[in-house]
Amino acid sequence: NLAVGSHLVCLPGTHSKWVGVRDGRIQRIATAMTGELYAVLRQHSILGRLMPVDDTRFDAFAFDAGLRRSEQAGGMLHHLFGVRTAGLFQQIAEPALPSYLSGLLIGHELRASGAFSQKPRPAQVHLVGNDRLLASYAHALTSLGIGVQRHPEDLAAHGLHALWSRRSATRSNADV
């Protein structure tokens, strides 16, 4: 229940959403193109040529290395070039490169969301989405010492329906 207190909700996907909620009211929304950027880099860049076609295998060690790299100086563009270097010099095995790239991008997304520089830092993030995406985000958040509560992907549709119903009811009452 998000009706009382401050909460942070993440809806990972092609365009991930970060929603700050206080006492049941949306305070802020931030969007990141993490999923789309991952797909573009995998399918249409020199990085994708270094990786296997099938990227369904999750390598926790490589993912964590990407998360750690995202914390370091240099910025995301420099870090992305480092993915190429790691692949060319076999510092990270080819099958693990997609997990490394994913960890790097998600790590940058977490930091860019601004939620983790707040004081106090959120103790928990509500994750809404499919199990595969939630697993990566849950892994990243728990590695940062932040708890997660998972919610099914249809929760977002239910929430939008509730907002629409409330809006429609408000308009109907205003017409009276």
Report each predicted region and the residues it spans.
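Glycine-rich phosphate-binding loop plus the immediately following alpha-helix
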Residues: 1-8, 12, 17-69, 73
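Adenine-nucleotide phosphate-binding core of ATP-dependent small-molecule kinases
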Residues: 69-110
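Conserved active-site and cofactor/substrate-binding residues in soluble primary-metabolism enzymes
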Residues: 32, 36, 75, 97, ...
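Short active-site-adjacent structural elements
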Residues: 17-19, 114-115, 134-138
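Glycine-rich phosphate-binding/hydrolytic loop that grips phosphoryl groups
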Residues: 149-176
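Phosphate/pyrophosphate-binding loops at sites that engage ATP/ADP/AMP, CoA/4′-phosphopantetheine
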Residues: 110-121
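Glycine-rich phosphate-binding loops at beta-strand->alpha-helix junctions
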Residues: 122-140
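Short hydrophobic/aromatic-enriched beta-strand-loop microsegments
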Residues: 27-32, 144-154
